[in-house]
Each structure stands twice: as C-alpha cells, then as structure tokens.
Amino acid sequence: MTAGQIPGPIFRDSRDLTPFGAGQVRTPVKEIAEGVGGLIHGVLGGRDSARISVDGSVPRLRLLPGKTAKAVYDAIFANTDPNRLIAAAREYPGWAGLCYVMAGLLAHKQGGYLRAVELLQRGLSIRNDDDANQFAASYLTRVVTRVEVAERVEVPVLFSEESVFLALSHSLRETGQTEAALEALTMLPPSLPTALARCALAYTLGRDQEVAVWTEGLLNADDLSAALLLVRARSLRRLGAHEQAQRALKEVLRRRRTSMALRNDALTDRALLVLDNGRKSLNPRDWRRRRAELETFEVIRKDVQERRLWEQEWKELDGD
C-alpha cells in the first residue's frame, strides 16, 4: 500500500500500550537548558550523552552470556562509535541485522543522518538469528530513540519497529529524500506521532488533500495533536478551504496548556488567513467597482455641499 491509498484518518491508535513517550516542542531556551544539563550530568559521572539512550539504567548482562552476546552488548551500551557495531556485524553474521540497526540508531542520535540511512536500510534487509532476536527482547526494550517527527517536535520512542522506521524516515528527510521518507512510514500502524511525521512530509510534497483526509476529526488533546492541527490548517489553507482551516486553528488555541510556540504559530497562521481573505475580496474587479462607487459618492458629496451653500446665501438675502 502506498502513501496515497489510506482512505481515512491515520492518527487513531487503538493499542493499550505504545512505544511512544510524551512529545516535546523544542525551543531555543529548552535546547540551551538541555545542553547545560547534559554537561553537568557528564561532569558528575553520568552516562555519556553520545551513547545509545536508555530509559532508566542500562540492563545488566546475565551470567555466562556467551562471547557473541557480550561483544554485542558492549558495542551497544558501552560505546559511542558506530564502527564498533559494524565490526560486530561482520564478525557475527547471524547478528548482523541487529548490529547494523543499532549502529544506524547511534549514528542518527549523533546527527550522522546519511550514514544512519545506509546502516538502517542495510540492517532492515538482513534476517537475524533466533539468538539475536532473543537478545533484543531481553536487553533492548528500554533503548530510547528521540525522533523529530516534525519541525521542532520530538518524540521519544522505545526500541521497536516504529522507532527504527521513524528514525529512518527522519534521516531520509534530513538528507533531502522526502518521498522516500514518506514511503518509509507507510506500513507503520496508526498513531499520532507517525501521523504527524507523515502529514508533515505530505505537506512538504504538496499532498494537501491527503493531509486533509488523514487528519479529519482531530481534536487538540496534547501538543502532538496541536502540531498536527497546524499542518492540517496549512494544507486546508492551500486548498482554499479557509473556513475549515480557521476551525483547525481555533482548535489549536482552545486548549490553554498548548505549547506557547504552537499557539504563536496558530496566531500567525490565523493572521495569514485573514490576509488571504482580504486579498480574495479585493481583486481587480472589486477595486474597479469600489472606485466607481467612490466617484459617485464624491459627486453626491459635492452636490450636497453646493446646495447647502446656495441655501445659506438665500437665507442671508432674506435677512437683508
């Protein structure tokens, strides 16, 4: 199924448990605070920020794990260089798929998006041994990948099919491969983060009708849905559906706890809608009609003024 064949909304997630954490709207202030916090954490002996992220503490390796499991464990949790995972993939072919995927996630975290694309695609194309799959189920469930699903909007995702494909899509987007980035998300189950990523990409590609269909019925329940409503409003505006776009922006502004950055975007977009409506109403034909009306009013005004002067002169004559 291709990206354009989904017949309805794609943001409704019916699962009881999902791999997604709370989304975050990034601002310059937050980025500075996180940078300072990371430096302090490193000075105090915390986990190196360049390593794979983990929710909580790193899982302990079981007793007598075997040479392969120990080597891969160390390459994942005690390493900041994707090359070490690539070396492990070459040394242990049955674990190659897992090693390449983890190397790709590490490269993605470090901002090496072109390399992340190559490693993730290669890892996804290789079948793992049962031992590698068991290792992933035992040790990788708390690995977290922070993915930018739209501009300034990040979501933490636990290790899963969704974390891998969202990271791949983000990396493709960062390397200018927008079509491929959208295609990478096609087979993922419906969810709000995936819907935001897909709609942001579709909007960039000018697929506004798809965005409108995919977001039909969306309400502002959190910042992710507010960000998605902004994308919806912009697509509707480009389609000329200004009334629907206005409703989407009103929904963004309805919830008081909506991120201030998103509220400001909504206010800006609402002003642009008003400007669009003004331009639409002031087309050249309207200007010509209004100009003729103004000229008529000017003639009437002058006639009334002359009549008043004439009446005033008669009153003065009568007084004499």
Located regions from the model:
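Alpha-helical junction/boundary sensor with strong preference for TPR arrays
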Residues: 92-93, 127-128, 191-192, 215, ...
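The canonical alpha-helical register within tetratricopeptide repeats
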Residues: 87-91, 122, 129, 183, ...
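Flexible helix-coil transition and linker loops at the boundaries of alpha-helical arrays
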Residues: 57-61, 85-92, 126-161, 185, ...
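N-terminal alpha-helical interaction modules that lie
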Residues: 2-87, 93, 98, 121-141
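Generic helix N-cap/helix-start motif at coil->alpha-helix transitions
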Residues: 22-24, 28-36, 59-70, 93-100, ...
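C-terminal non-catalytic interaction modules
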Residues: 4, 271-320
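Helix-turn-helix repeat elements of alpha-solenoid scaffolds
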Residues: 36-51, 72-84, 112-148, 170-180, ...
